[in-house]
Amino acid sequence: MMNIELAPSGEEFTLSPTVIKVIGAGGGGSNAVNRMMSCGLQCVEFIAANTDVQALSYSTAPKKLAIGTKVTRGLGAGGDPEIGEKAAMEDAEAIASALQGANMVFITAGMGGGTGTGAAPVIAKIARELGALTVAVVTKPFRFEGRAKMMLAERGIEKLRTHSDTVIVIPNQNLLSVVDKRCPIKETYLVADDLLRKSVQSISDLITLPGEVNLDFMDVKNTMEGQGYALIGVGEGEGENRAVDAATAAINNPLLEETRIEGATRLLVAVRGSENLSMGEVDGVMSVVAKTIDPDAIIIHGTSIDASMQDRVRVTVIATGVPQASISIAGDTHSSQKIKTSSYGAVSTGVYISSDEWNRAKSSKQPNLPGLATRNSAVQETRMEKNGVKGHTFGVPLPSVNEDLDEPTFLRNRNKGL
């Protein structure tokens, strides 16, 4: 064991590693936690919180919180975020106890449902009050799930942003740009869970794994604390142009909200490769990133060596302080080109695509989602009114038939005078 001698300062204190906790809220969040655990995510404590006791019993998290049993009797929130919110408030002390001692808390949830949408902002508020760096990584519904659910998700994300240091949003709709249309439903949702896992892992690895140019918890905290919306991209490359390809794929990751980092005020760039990673390749990565962002943006970079990378290079880019106008609220992707999960280009691996594939998809002029019939929103609204759902749900005015959800929320509200 290595002995570390501390310079005397006259003060007594205890050295301890960074404590990172991940809490999954609701069914979607619990599924993401299961995925992270099955992939062997290290140096992280896992918690699952749900109003549905039966669903909670299937969680593999070592700590399970059945929240809101007085409100829901353990039967779930029924898709109502207000019930999810009340459930989390009912068991605020239990949530605080589970999160106690954490330096960093990740909150993961599927937005648009009941428990995740309602409970996640409450959990974020508790975590932040405990002094933890609070990062939410959440998904938004598929477009076919309807306008009402999308509006609930957007409202939940806005609440979450208020109480979190940073929010990373992954629209499920964008999965359709990278999986084959014949991909089974179960596998598609596994890809969504894996995206949540990769987002959390790419950040936690920066803190827990050593590097040649090291990044630590304070680097991550200074980049993400109080920054609102964030974008994260992870790209891998191999071959002669592996570093540049990895950087290009990272900043053009189509699976997040439209990845436009131009307005970011802070960036954290991590480069990981094997022992043959050269300084010239690191310089190439930073050059690609620098050409994309504001020259006055603060950039923190780190480099680490991992023998298991072999001939591959992985680049992680975390961009924070992103203006809301740079975020695609509707979560659309303008590409209709589908990429089979078994046929990625030679310079890309996992669920990410190469720079060449990205450029081909981006330049495609075909209409989005061919074969899907146009949903009749008027019929949907009529059914909702018959069921007594009218006016506001979870504090959200239901959208009219004529509203364009491709327009960002803040612009729609401004036009309404809100």
Curated annotation (Swiss-Prot):
GTP binds at G27, G28, G29, S30, N31, G114, T115, G116, E145, K149, D193. The keyword Cell cycle applies. GO terms for molecular function: GTP binding; GTPase activity. Keywords: Cell cycle, Cell division, Cytoplasm, GTP-binding, Nucleotide-binding, Septation. Residues 386-418 are annotated as: Disordered. Gene3D superfamilies: Tubulin/FtsZ, GTPase domain. It comes from the Bacteria. GO terms for biological process: division septum assembly; FtsZ-dependent cytokinesis; protein polymerization. SMART domains: Tubulin, Tubulin_C. The keyword Cytoplasm applies. Belongs to the FtsZ family. Homodimer. Polymerizes to form a dynamic ring structure in a strictly GTP-dependent manner. Interacts directly with several other division proteins. PANTHER family: CELL DIVISION PROTEIN FTSZ-RELATED, MITOCHONDRIAL DIVISION PROTEIN FSZA. This is Cell division protein FtsZ. It comes from Treponema pallidum (strain Nichols). The lineage of its organism: Bacteria, Pseudomonadati, Spirochaetota, Spirochaetia, Spirochaetales.
